[in-house]
Amino acid sequence: MREHSRRNRSLGFQQVVDIYFGVETVSGVLVMKRVVPAVRITVEAFCLRLLKLTNGLGPALFFSMVIIGITSSALAQSPDLRWRVEWRNTIEAAQREGKVVVSIPASAELRQALEEGFKKQFPRINQESLPAQGANNINRIFQEDKGGVHYFDVHIGGTSSIITGLLPAGLLEPLMPWMILPEVKKPKNWWGGHIWADAAGQYIYMFLAYLTETLWYNTKELRPEEVKSYDDLLKPKLKGRIEILDPRTPGSGQSTWSFLWKVKGEEYLKKLVRQDLILGRNQRQLAESLANGKAALSIGLSYYTFSPFLKAGLPIKPLPVPEEGIYASSGSGNVVTLKTAPHPNASKVFINWLLSREGQEVFTGAMGQPTRRLDVDTAWTKQFGQIAAKDVLTPKRFFELENQSEEVIRTVRIPAAALAHKLLD
């Protein structure tokens, strides 16, 4: 009988707590929710309600439960409960909105990976990814905004078009308030903490960080020890033998050119142009030119362009990093939210998923570009010419080498691109 009484008391306490809050697991996260209307009642009425529910519990336990009831709203404001309640409410609102529309880089593989990964966690929220070159989607966002049409919620891509377009137009929403999950919000989970591309540190979140091998050579035409510094590119032997992805257009050719402008200066680039550079915009043709020995050294192409030639056993290899270094990048791993997002809650859910461990595993796996998350393996990307910054750099060195922040774009890349037009047009 005594055991039965203890069991009843235990069940009674659980019943009251469950009636007031309710416990549920949403997307692998335990959340608490109210299951009674959020109405104000007197303490007396609340006590009577509790007394009826508890039906004869001892005074100490009864008044403990009164305290629990009275202070429940305060408990909901504690850090742990607050984010759980916010996450639950956001998911419910996102499900009512039904979908989130995301502008992404031009990759069918990424589109499939994002849509499948997100749907697995949130089957009641449709994630529509629209792949295109960053500038194309951003131009569409601009045109639709002028016409009062707001289709996109989130944009993921390189920073140039964002910094020169969306940011000054005032179309972006601060992103930090949208971070809800502790694993996303806590800086300790990210190499370098939270890194932003915009000067205000609010709008453009850089979730990738890596070095890209964009210097390649033909092993039959050049020995790697012959190029230990960028100054060695000015040797007479290499005149007419260096090709470069046209630095007048956005891409890794322009990024490398800008890095040279930064570390070697304008006079150096003038001398480099006098080396009779082989200019090209067709990456396949440039890769063939290096593979067949027409060019001895290539600037601006990545592993993926050379991949079929490497598989065929042709004599091309990445050049060891010159003593001045190579540029660091966040690549296409930058995310922003639009101020006019038609599905704000679904956007929050997507951003938190994207920046979670799972989301970053999906993005890095599809793009081969290393994340800054410390709990995601990125060592494997090195074999594809993408070297994770967290594996080889300090955050301080990354900031010295990076090429995608607002400051670098305005003070380095824009003037460097202008010089490219001046010298090469």
Tell me what each language-model feature is:
Residues 83, 390-425:
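Conserved C-terminal helix/tail region of periplasmic/extracytoplasmic solute-binding proteins
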